[in-house]
Amino acid sequence: MITKGQVRLLRTYSYDSNLYTQGLEQLNNNHILLSAGRYGFSKVGVYDLTQEIFSEKIAFPDTVFAEGLTVVEDYFWLLTYKEGVAYKFDKAICNCLGAYPFEGDGWGLAYDKENQCLWMTSGNAFLQKRDPKDFALLDTVLVAIESVPISMLNELEYVDGYLYANIWQTNTIVKLQPDSGKVVATYDISPLLKALNLDKSHYPDLNVLNGIAHLDQQRFLITGKLYPLMLEVVLD
């Protein structure tokens, strides 16, 4: 049985509405590592929760569309959309440590510390299990709700044995078991977005919900592409 999870707003943060948010991950109590996409605008930087300011650390050439990212110990991985390359960066100073080829699109990425692997999405209904050292493909897992495949899996966050995933072009976040691909809960963010007037009538450039960063327990940060706010929520 699929649980319909509850979403509770704790607070909002002012956010840079020029950021086409792709990856979002906590670095420490006050700082969030994030990637922003689009050709000509792709970058990686750090968002300061105390000052509510984004600081750019890496700017990419116009030929690169940055996608999801995830931290693995003292380095982090960054996907590209159509370029077929995953970049490995030093976490402290953002030096590039290598570029690793992969097939297909790059969308979302999360590090599973318990099983020492990466989980990746490509916009379809499959998770890709990858080696966190060299990005080698280890396995693929079909994600489904009651045997119905769920496509357009996007940004990912791994928390206590589960993956939380944005579904592209929706306001839904799903919670799933990565090894089986079974969805165990869904979270509808639509009522919260409506209450905050996060819609096209108030913000014409607003794009889709995207970006999940785990803080602690059931607290998360969520945002979207070209969003003016980042939301701190509880996902029960």
Where are these regions (language model features)?
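A short helix->beta-strand "capping" segment at the edge of beta-propeller domains
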Residues: 1-18, 51-55, 199
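Blade/loop signatures of beta-propeller domains
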Residues: 1-7, 34, 38-49, 133
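Beta-strand-rich domains and repeat architectures in extracellular enzymes and scaffolds
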Residues: 10-43, 58-70, 224-230
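Beta-rich, blade/repeat-based domains predominating
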Residues: 17-28, 62-72, 102-114, 147-159, ...
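Conserved beta-strand positions in repeat-built beta-propeller and related beta-rich domains
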Residues: 32-38, 76-83, 118-124, 165-169, ...
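Short loop/turn segments that connect beta-strands within beta-propeller blades
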Residues: 47-52, 90-94, 131-135, 177-181, ...
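Blade-loop segments of beta-propeller domains
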Residues: 52-81, 85-88, 94-108
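Hydrophobic, well-structured mid-protein blocks that either form specific transmembrane helices
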Residues: 86-146
